[in-house]
Swiss-Prot record:
Gene3D superfamilies, sorted: ATP-grasp fold, A domain, ATP-grasp fold, B domain, Succinyl-CoA synthetase domains
Positions that bind substrate: N265, G322, I323, V324
An annotated GO BP: tricarboxylic acid cycle
Keyword vocabulary terms for this entry: ATP-binding, Ligase, Magnesium, Metal-binding, Nucleotide-binding, Tricarboxylic acid cycle
Matches recorded under HAMAP family: Succ_CoA_beta (MF_00558)
PROSITE patterns per the UniProt record, alphabetical: ATP_GRASP (PS50975), SUCCINYL_COA_LIG_3 (PS01217)
Cofactor binding, per record: Binds 1 Mg(2+) ion per subunit.
Pathway where this protein functions: Carbohydrate metabolism; tricarboxylic acid cycle; succinate from succinyl-CoA (ligase route): step 1/1
Protein name from the UniProt record: Succinate--CoA ligase [ADP-forming] subunit beta
GO molecular function: ATP binding; magnesium ion binding; succinate-CoA ligase (ADP-forming) activity; succinate-CoA ligase (GDP-forming) activity
Subunit structure: Heterotetramer of two alpha and two beta subunits.
Family recorded in the similarity comment: Belongs to the succinate/malate CoA ligase beta subunit family.
Length: 387
């Protein structure tokens, strides 16, 4: 689950980090009032969306008066912002953040952390190249990114943070401020179950103060049951409507741009299914994993979800029966086909637990379902069914 910038800054501030002061506004009048309340000569108006690249897309503007703040807010709120990280429709802007002017600054740094699956540790990354896309830095100048793996048994140690500060070229009070920032960020990461966080840029002001000018936090969705207050911050308007609906039924769904709908149990099998569809000349319309313990109700909802996509011209159902029985899947498919009034070809491949029984149920149903013997045969048939 992603947080908005203003939410991320509020959370980081509660852990002792110095953040750029700001006020969220949901309409132009609130934006004008926020400018006056901050009391500076300048302010920065930022569209609050779950996407990067806001500046290049016109979602970040410097304003010099409350009237300018009002006008910029009016141009953003209620519109969709399209960035390189969104689809063609963009993300809806329901609010803007009015943030204090912290410039001029002497340096812009980068600080972030992720759960590194290869090392199975929280890994911090820092760089002197703040204020730019960190992916570009990693690609063009990987030597400029410092990495620190954190031993989960002892946590991030002050000496590790000091070492990073030295390598970033900080000095004097800046070192202590950076250590406090990094240790506070780690504490927030662990206690709030972050999956990722970024401060870009982490600015060093002329007076030596270190300030978080931006903040990005992604929370581990599997841990949200432990954080009801954080869950309350969820902005569903920023999420794909189909993916949101899928999550409500415990389905793992990702929309793609093809025309062959896929329903599979197991993420690995789902990826293999998409690969073989591509191999046979087709294009998958989605990734959809109904899970190893799929129920009849979940399969029916998955079928509806696939067919809600008007681009879907054929469907491939690929089920390996382990925990889930193929005969139960077959009954759910029949029920779903009847309920949804399917008008596109449906290819079904069943293997494993009660596969023969499931195949017989489908054959006796009288429905125009296309049976497949093996994964290659299924991919070949679903691609050919498109004509």
């Amino acid at each position: 689950m992603n947080l908005h910038e203003y939410q991320a800054k509020d959370l980081l501030e509660s852990y002792g980090l110095k953040v750029q002061k700001g006020i969220v506004a949901h309409n132009p009048n609130e934006a004008a009032q926020a400018f006056d309340q901050l009391g500076g000569k300048f302010a920065v108006v930022k569209a609050q969306v779950h996407a990067g690249g806001r500046g290049k897309a016109g979602g970040v503007k410097v304003v010099k008066s409350s009237q300018e703040a009002r006008e910029v807010a009016e141009s953003l709120i209620g519109k969709n912002l399209v960035t390189f990280q969104t689809d063609a429709e963009g993300q809806p802007v329901n609010s803007v953040g009015i943030f204090e002017d912290v410039y001029p600054v002497t340096r812009e740094l980068y600080l972030g952390a992720v759960v590194d699956r290869s090392s199975r540790k929280v890994t911090f990354m820092a760089s002197t190249e703040g204020g730019v896309d960190i992916e570009e830095v990693a690609h063009n100048s990987p030597e400029k990114i410092l990495k620190v793996e954190v031993d989960p048994l002892v946590g991030l140690q002050p000496f590790q943070a000091r070492e990073v500060a030295f390598k970033l070229g900080l000095e004097g009070k800046q070192i202590n401020d950076f250590v406090k920032t990094m240790l506070g960020a780690y504490k927030a990461f662990i206690e709030c179950d972050f999956a990722l966080f970024e401060i870009n840029p982490l600015a060093v002001r002329e007076n030596g103060e270190i300030v978080c000018v931006d903040g990005k936090i992604n929370l581990d969705s599997n841990a949200l049951y432990r954080h009801p207050k954080l869950l309350a911050l969820r902005d569903k308007s920023q999420e794909n409507a189909k993916e949101l609906k899928a999550s409500e039924h415990e389905l793992n769904y990702v929309a793609l741009e093809g025309n062959i709908g896929c329903m599979v149990n197991g993420a690995g099998l789902a990826m293999a299914t998409m690969d073989i569809i591509q191999l046979y000349g087709g294009k998958p319309a989605n990734f959809l994993d109904v899970g190893g313990g799929a129920t009849k109700e979940r399969v029916i909802e998955a079928f509806k979800l696939i067919l809600d996509d008007e681009n879907v011209k054929a469907v491939l159902i690929n089920i390996f029966g382990g925990i889930v029985r193929c005969d139960m899947i077959a009954e759910a498919i029949i029920e779903a086909v009847k309920e949804v009034n399917v008008t596109v070809p449906v290819v079904v491949r069943l293997e494993g637990n009660n596969a023969e029984k499931g195949a017989k149920i489908l054959a006796d149903s009288g429905l125009k379902l296309i049976p497949a013997d093996g994964l290659a045969d299924a991919a070949d048939k679903v691609v050919k069914s498109l004509g």
